[in-house]
Amino acid sequence: MNRKTLAALVGAIVLAVASSGVALAAGSGPAVTVQIKSLTKTLVKSASVHGEKGSITKGGTPRGKCPGNTAAGALDAATHGKWTGKYYASVPGIFVTSILGVKPSGSDFWEVLVNGKASNSGICAIKLRAGQRLLFKIAK
């Protein structure tokens, strides 16, 4: 095999390995479906996402306190980071204050339903499982 052919072959292999690594780095963990609804409209109809690598650090959350492979990571992926929250060490977790610019009014709040059932856990404690359906909606 001549040098040019060998160099081209090695280059193609390196490129293939590098591009597959980039695809893997885009998400972490199993695929879940995220839907987001305000009181009056659907903000995200249905997005298939993976959690995120590392930690979610919204609202002053210390690194490592909210893993990216949780509902918080799925929310972050589905909204491209366009949500806000406040970290509470006593819970510990993030209380969601707005999603895609929508803030609940009065005593309303963002809640998460997992496979159609209201979760008793915060978004940092809901570990992602393949095929899971997450609905973030404003509750009264």
Predicted regions, residues:
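Ubiquitin-like/PB1-type beta-grasp interaction modules and other compact soluble beta-rich domains
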Residues: N2-K140
